[in-house]
Amino acid sequence: MLVIFLGILGLLANQVLGLPTQAGGHLRSTDNPPQEELGYWCTYMESCKFCWECAHGICKNKVNESMPLIIENSYLTSCEVSRWYNQCTYSEGNGHYHVMDCSNPVPHNRPHRLGRKIYEKEDL
């Protein structure tokens, strides 16, 4: 009975958050989340490479138009994300994980912002 209740709760959380309910609301670990979920994933971990489109060393955020252009550097990390019921996980591949309730997300951007270099025209 508890399992059924938790399953229903997980599906409801996905609907509230606007996340697709594919495969019962689960998302296997991937470094390429579905396009329609980028808004969610990139809000809480903006340094993931899949959130940025880079050309010639200059990167533009795919989701947030107000983000400044940045220089491609170590700020961008290779992330994998996954979702199992109401647990959303970011893995940076170096043993660092950020786990949060999908319905109560907590940004994990601060540690990476220190390495971000905003693009200035003089950088060319």
Curated annotation (Swiss-Prot):
Coiled coil: none annotated. Keywords: Early protein, Glycoprotein, Signal, Virion. Its main location: virion. It is found in: Virion; Host endoplasmic reticulum-Golgi intermediate compartment. It comes from the Viruses. A motif (Prevents secretion from ER) lies at residues 121-124. GO terms for cellular component: host cell endoplasmic reticulum-Golgi intermediate compartment; virion component. The keyword Glycoprotein applies. It holds the Pfam family v110. Residues 1-28 form the signal peptide. Belongs to the asfivirus MGF 110 family. Causes the redistribution of lumenal ER protein to an enlarged ERGIC compartment. This is Protein MGF 110-4L. It comes from African swine fever virus (strain Badajoz 1971 Vero-adapted).
